[in-house]
Amino acid sequence: MVILYKALRYIVITIICLFLAFIGLLAYLFVTQANIEQVNYIEGCKSDETLTVYCDFQNPEDLAVLPDNRHILVSEFGAIIPLSPVNIQGNLSLLDTIDGSKRNLEIEMSENDWGDPKCERENTIFSPHGIDINQRVDGSYQLAIVNHMPTETIELFQLREINDTWSLRWRGCVDAPVHGYFNDVALKSNGSFYVSQMYDKNTSLFMLAVLDNTKEDTGYVYHWTRQNGFERLKNTDGAFPNGVELSEDESNLFINYAFGNKTSKYNLMSESIEATFSMNGIPDNITIDGDYLWVGAQDHSGLDSLIHCGVFANDVFEDPMTNQCPLPFAAYHLKQSDLSLVNSYKYSNTVMGTVTVALSVNGKLFFGTYHGDRIASVELSKE
């Protein structure tokens, strides 16, 4: 009995100590990472003196300009686990940059001749995340999307314009590896692609908060080909790989590490990191602009995102029905050659927040978000 009593006492003390350590860690994370002192919640969907907003979108997380240089293809994001308890259906739509109108894209199903023949799809229910458009060797335009529903896949489409109307023709899919959890994709002209593995899909919300603080490696980048499937790229491991983008000559891959707070230039020939740009915020998606890059970033910490835009938002928001997360954001204009900073644009307490992508089209910079109901734009000549 004495031995049993001591064992039980030891177990109870251990549990109490672990609980106190857990509370202490949460307090430490809050003090060291939560840095937004005041948040002005966004009411309605109206433009202001700086930003023009385009309403009625569902979490327009990633943007890509179409070949006509007029329309923007929008990935209307659903959700990712564990930031959401379950995956949520999203959509693919178009924004007309001339008249500001939105319309959905029609999708026609076809044979799987661009993806993995083993991958099957029976419907057009998607939960899109990162997207990319590129012209294939045969001249056709290909769209790739990271998709989270009903399973984790890369979905491949042919982008078609018929009678001045854009539509999509499904041309295949690729199933993710067993523990695959993707964020963004970058297409090559031969139909292969690069995709960022964020973290193991079984990672808990608490562990994500810890990893955001410790900056430990959580993922890497894959290269997929029809011949060899997924192959992990050497020297791409990092803290939450996020946006990826390929240079026009396909010799360099640009990678954002969200928890690592940096953008890196990866030489595909030497398989090494050649340059890095560091920031205080969270780099998300990357877009190409001639010899330059645009990096959309959240100008706050990961914990701020959880508090104001994540699972705790309903307890923090004055109005739980707030559609647009209001946290500060930034856009960084970088040289492709060495990732040196050309300029940065920072915004707070405006009609947009928590930006994930910055896309330059015809003198305007368009912003998307993973938690909001709008796209915004700014005239670059006025900045």
Go through each PLM region and give its residues:
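Short loop/turn segments that connect beta-strands within beta-propeller blades
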Residues: 96-100, 159-163, 224-228, 267-271, ...
